[in-house]
């Protein structure tokens, strides 16, 4: 097959600028082949190279005594004691999920699971953070149904519990939904597998499913805005098979026990290209690939297609040659392909041969290490206009407005489509607060949460970035966990626009300050830019996934609210209504500044919760919807009413940060009051849990009536 001529239009269609193509000419010293152009396009796109964000990502705190492996590998690795480690990462699959919701979301789950077990860890938990357009938008229902089905379909069949996540709706996501997938696994701390190749002449082995044409150019597609040609991009979306992935995981983990693995890398974005280049680059070696040896499922595939295919459930390994037969036997047992497709070489070359013809011959280190790195112009987000007058709303009417909104109604409709109990180690299922999974065979547990409030980031990127981390810290603390580390998923619009780049820079500054103050280093992550359609960007959405350790299951703070329990608020209440949920849902206003985050107070309050958990029967952080929504959710979950003394909108629905709602009996409340006073912290009695009504001041409604609204509104909105 004759390859197309390299023209300006072809270069542009590969997402390369004229300046970038000139750089390629200088590197190669000649006109690149079509396959070489595709390889550069894959390695230099935003999705793989982080060329617009790398400068700022370097400023994130990524180290700590608990960190075994930080950013740069497939996933982060954190020590949890007793010779064990938790391996985790969050990653986006936004563009594919908008084009093909089911497969886009499903393969997002599959990709993040591979990142975890490639490191030698068995996945034990998954989460997802989903953002959609307004519920009335003609595409939203299709996207929600497809994405949720894809997440559940893949995760359920693979056999990993989904223990948490978020679902939000805003018109800013009408043209670009966000699908951020998180996975965590367990491994022996001294048996982590890395991707750096080692040794000259070592076999490079292809593992897993066969290669097809699905996903060709997927990484490049994910590095551009959408326009009216979106439907033409459907073939760039990968197709997943969770049962093959399950077999691949079992085979990979079994293979790792044989000692045959020198290095291993999953094939994700840019497929065979990116995995081979990364392995060679990290090991300071070259790589030769013979593509006629690659297992394929379609006829007459070209070198270009094989190098850029993003077919799922595939891995690349550098093998100890003396253990080839033992390794092959493992993959034969699991009915998966095992093919030696190349070797490591001493020369700094990335050599691609197909049917005896050299299709690409490039300097590997240069290909990996000289992707453009841009210092994009940016402007700081201007200070938000002051919040105008907010008239008081009847408290129960305000609550009803929140719990009937798809943003704050129960997400049972979503979570019941996920298997939350598979593996039988789930301690707390999704619905309220952080998810908890027992470390199998031990008395320890891990807690997981995913958090961000995009409207805060839009108004004030620095405070919004801080708040995303702080809320994750609070969610972990509220269940009794000690926060360990975080993973970030940075979802933004077009970085070539200074105002968008300013949002990114501000959020990074806020996140950096928060993870440093709260001792939650960033150990892995992902950047998704160009989330725009026809020039309209999403809300800036820097999602934070966080993991905490519960040393003993007895230390878990439960949800044991009972009639007669006292309601306490830890932290100061000032009635901050700027950018609040009540302002948006009742008044349709997005005004004022985001609430400020006092990181010293956040740390002190989290430490106080953990130190005094023996006195606490139930605990939740106060975030969206303030005290009113938190108290209702806690009461509704327990099936008992709640009476709060306050009746004014600011006290009930304000979103001051750093606060927790605590339920306990009277004696425990007294002990907590004394402890808080001694620590110099503010702890206030705000009411009690009792009866079967929700009463805020003089306004009340039956709990059962409000519970029906809360439980049924989400599904009804999608009907």
Curated annotation (Swiss-Prot):
GO CC, any one term: cytoplasm
Pfam families per record: AIRS, AIRS_C, FGAR-AT_linker
Domain of life: Bacteria
Principal EC category: ligase
Organism for this UniProt entry: Roseobacter denitrificans (strain ATCC 33942 / OCh 114) (Erythrobacter sp. (strain OCh 114))
Gene Ontology molecular-function annotations: ATP binding; magnesium ion binding; phosphoribosylformylglycinamidine synthase activity
Cellular localization per UniProt: Cytoplasm
Binding site for ATP: 50, 89, 488, 525
Binding site for Mg(2+) 2: 115, 266
Protein name, as recorded: Phosphoribosylformylglycinamidine synthase subunit PurL
